[in-house]
Amino acid sequence: MTSLSAKIQDVFDEPACDTNRGKDAKARKEGCSKPLTPGASAGGCAFDGAKIVLQPITDVAHLVHAPLACEGNSWDNRGAASSGPTLWRTSFTTDLTELDIVMGQGERKLFKAIREIKETYAPPAVFVYSTCVTALIGDDIEAVCKRAAEKFGLAVVPINAPGLAGSKNLGNKLAAEALLDHVIGTVEPDDAGPYDINILGEFNLSGEFWLVKPLLDRLGIRVRACIPGDARYIDVASAHRARAAMMVCSSALINLARKMEERWDIPYFEGSFYGITDTSEALRNIAELLVRKGADAEILDRTETLIAEQEAIAWKKLEAYRRRLQGKRVLLNTGGVKSWSVVHALMEIGMEIVGTSVKKSTVEDKERIKRILKDENHMFEQMAARDLYAMLSKHKADIMLSGGRTQFVALKAKTPWLDINQERQHPYAGYDGMVELVRQIDLAIHNPIWGQVREPAPWDCQPAREDDLASAKNGTATVNAFNEFAGAMAHRFGDR
């Protein structure tokens, strides 16, 4: 745990973060995230954060050294997608029991599990995750991984990020440190070129990076490694030979980008593929960085030509939606990079942002929101479900974009809702992704079901019926009138 403590302190000292630089030594040791409330929600620990960052590496066997619940509770917490290997969809755990812990069999069981994975699946690497239990009982996973790597002839990488170490964000950064210490730089590619880039902090949710990669392909830009979305182990291992990098989610992997620049002189910038303007700006920045690193300057002209073509196509598709969505009010209850990138994207088509959550956003994210919205009145750290319901039930927003945890608040308030977090089913990146996002918003807002659910329920109309019945003398008179009507009708039909 001594090495883990040292690694945590190193992660908390981040020169690439101006906010971190502005803190004193005591505040820096506390990290960026607020302390967790035990039992408040599932996930959110350092182990969960490490698993989020590394599991999308698709051809690696991810082995959790823990009781079964640790793997079960963290399973499938990101809707990443793979274009090839499916090994990452197989769950591996040592399934420690009380007897294993009491008898000190943890390390031996881990070694046997690595051997079984090697013999059955033959992956290029095995990532071994420590957890609270194995950290507390003192299992030395680094020693076991080193011994297994020598014995079986494959990369066995220790991921020392037990849940008790801290927040999910800390786990993201500890996972990045594991890649830097054990993976990146271990393979020398034989095809490195002047147009190779890395994409950092892109998780390929719902396969959305596949909407961006064709644009880079048309420019002759090769993605050496997308970390972690749809990645392969050998791509990550050779990522140190890229010429430039784009950071998509700095709150998760800023330490990875900064240290790769220090060690291998790979310049990076932070950008977004959400929205037309941001996608175009990201392509320009990538081209400019490559030119600075020696690529032919003609790529700048080709980039502008591609941007003009794609923007024209996208705006033509969006024109029909603009008329239907102009002035519609949106509440964003998300965080991180989406707190500003999606805001910018929606404002491009004339939608009004009534609020955006900054709970998981960095100080830099908040500054971007201020510049986009021109003030900070629409930013909120956290909104209780009761306040959220009150806002939506008073029709202060036409739609809410959030994750699954708050969808039922919107549905209870009879307000359209769209999933925009990691569980989403549709890709929203790039030019085509922007069109898809707007299409989904339009479908949600103009779904005819909302007109029906907002109508008064039949039982809510009961008082009016009682008023009508009150005009009769009493219940008996009503029955008599009905009997007279029935008799008259029977007599009429009988006459025929």
Swiss-Prot record:
Pathway: Cofactor biosynthesis; Fe-Mo cofactor biosynthesis. It comes from the Bacteria. One of its GO terms (biological process) is protein-containing complex assembly. CDD domains: Nitrogenase_NifE_I (cd01968). GO terms for molecular function: nitrogenase activity. Keywords: Nitrogen fixation. InterPro entries: Nase/OxRdtase_comp1 (IPR000510), Nase_comp1_CS (IPR000318), NifE (IPR005973), NifE-like (IPR049939). This protein may play a role in the biosynthesis of the prosthetic group of nitrogenase (FeMo cofactor). PANTHER family: NITROGENASE IRON-MOLYBDENUM COFACTOR BIOSYNTHESIS PROTEIN NIFE (PTHR42956:SF1). Belongs to the NifD/NifK/NifE/NifN family. This is Nitrogenase iron-molybdenum cofactor biosynthesis protein NifE. It comes from Mesorhizobium japonicum (strain LMG 29417 / CECT 9101 / MAFF 303099). The lineage of its organism: Bacteria, Pseudomonadati, Pseudomonadota, Alphaproteobacteria, Hyphomicrobiales. The gene is nifE.
